[in-house]
From Swiss-Prot:
Family: Belongs to the amidase family. GatA subfamily.
Domain of life: Archaea
InterPro entries in the record: Amidase, Amidase_CS, Amidase_dom, AS_sf, GatA
EC number(s) recorded for this UniProt protein: 6.3.5.7
Protein name: Glutamyl-tRNA(Gln) amidotransferase subunit A
Listed GO CC annotations: glutamyl-tRNA(Gln) amidotransferase complex
Role summary: Allows the formation of correctly charged Gln-tRNA(Gln) through the transamidation of misacylated Glu-tRNA(Gln) in organisms which lack glutaminyl-tRNA synthetase. The reaction takes place in the presence of glutamine and ATP through an activated gamma-phospho-Glu-tRNA(Gln).
Coiled-coil region(s): none
GO biological process: translation
Organism of provenance: Methanococcus maripaludis (strain C6 / ATCC BAA-1332)
This protein's encoding gene: gatA
Oligomer status and interactors: Heterotrimer of A, B and C subunits.
Phylogenetic placement of the source organism: Archaea, Methanobacteriati, Methanobacteriota, Methanomada group, Methanococci
PANTHER family tied to this protein: GLUTAMYL-TRNA(GLN) AMIDOTRANSFERASE SUBUNIT A, MITOCHONDRIAL, TRANSAMIDASE
Active site feature: K55 (charge relay system), S130 (charge relay system), S154 (acyl-ester intermediate)
Amino acid sequence: MITDRVSDYLEKIEKSDVNAFIDVNSEKVLKEAEELEKNDYLKNKPLYGKIVAVKSNINVKGYKISCASKTLEKYTGTYDATVVKKLRLQGALIVGMTNMDEFASGSSGETSYFGPTKNPAAMDRIPGGSSSGSAAAVAADLCDMAIGSDTGGSIRNPASHCGIVGFKPSYGVVSRQGLCDLAMSFDQIGPLTKNAEDALVLTNAIKGIDRSDSTSLETPKFEKKDISNYKVGVVKEFMDVTDEKIRNEIEKGIEVFKDMGCKIVDLSYKYIDLALPTYYLINYVEFFSATRKYDGRRYGEFIEEACGEEVLRRILIGKHISEQEFSGKYYKKALQARKAMKKEMLGLFNSADLIVGPTVPKLPHKLGEDLSPMEMYAYDVLTVPTNICGICSGVVRCGNIQGVPVGLQIQGAPLEDEKVLSAMIEFEKNY
């Protein structure tokens, strides 16, 4: 019975000390489960009875959509985001809203107004962010699967640290209507799951064109493909910036592709040093613009007076860069760099079907450890190129270092999501 499974998960959530959830409405989800059991039309849908957690920056009617900030602490969603509507139409149940870095501004899961999320795979370490609660909920078996958002690695980073699967679709594949934006030219909604097969199913469920999001695209259903004849690229610079212990685990993963019949191709990406400055300069400006709606009048509190340190830092830097006398010095140059980075990245896919390598260059730090902003941003150096270039990218578990999971990142050209998802599935089977 679906209601029994829901009750079991609710009990697990209640007993958990991971702090993966911000808002859970037991009465609401149990009532919806009872109604679902009577709904014969949905019984053959791919997500029938699946219990899904949703990141707290995606609107779900009747739940707190706080973005893990005091700014929106009292705001309740008045509608379902397009992805949530699609989940319901496929027979899924929403169990609650997950914890996250405040306004998705972070890579550790520590900046939430509601307290840090713990990593179920290594409880004394960060789970990664910003989709920290979604990843932790899946890793701790507090739900069947979860939805997160990825602006510069916010699905893939925590998936790697927590030892689960995460997928960032190509830009436009999934509607962002109902997402509280961080940087709209980077943002993408995607799945966090226990295995790659589920990532394929969940991506198919939420993707598709949406008249409410002009960037959204219609794509055919993603199917599993044979990857045995694929050329798999390994970028030297991605490996060079990665800690040796992680690199060793990734090299074992590359051997798996070789054993599957793939040809390994050595590649070079000369713009790796531009990745972080380009990403963050654009991110700051877009985030400053996005936060102007949190003025304390229509809903919530005035963001500059209520937000945490990292969010305020990004707002103030974004404001500074946005001022007319500075835009040519920073922002416009960042846009030029983005164009060059994208051209270079797309060129790599002329030589390879996929690019594989590390997800993050170092192991997650200990909870509460004091890192400078630049040390924190360094977690993103291997994930932000995906968002800068609008390509697709997934993460699957690839070993561990003293019990701390390591994730293998698989990248594909724009709208080649099917290739990446297929490679994730095949890697998982053969690893």
